[in-house]
A protein has these predicted regions:
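Beta-strand-rich recognition/accessory modules
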Residues: 1-99
Length: 99
């Protein structure tokens, strides 16, 4: 998935945790804000205001990797972006991120 991080600076990964017979859903969502109440996101200056009649465009590209070479290429691109930076995984919501 490719998108402009300056225009879509937030990214959410979520899953539906209902029973398996109900189906399993996961979401990977670039966004202008986090999935919190609008008032909370507004307080944290993450609400994009669009004037009446105005539009805002975002570009998003999704690639499907159908063979080992394509998968290896995607893995290399990710490794190049990560460099030597280790991932940070938090055990609890961080201040300012979650209502």
């Amino acid at each position: 998935m490719f998108f402009n991080k300056k225009k879509l600076p937030c990214y959410s990964v979520w899953k539906n945790t209902t029973a398996s017979p109900d189906g399993y859903v996961t979401g990977l969502e670039p966004a202008t804000n986090f999935p919190n109440p609008r008032t909370y996101e507004g307080e944290n200056r993450r609400v994009l205001n669009v004037a009446p009649g105005a539009t805002k465009e975002f570009d998003l590209r999704i690639e499907i990797h159908t063979d080992p070479a394509a998968i290896e290429g995607a893995e290399k691109a990710i490794a190049d972006i990560q460099g030597d930076t280790p991932p940070r995984v938090y055990d609890a919501p961080q201040p300012g991120w979650c209502a």
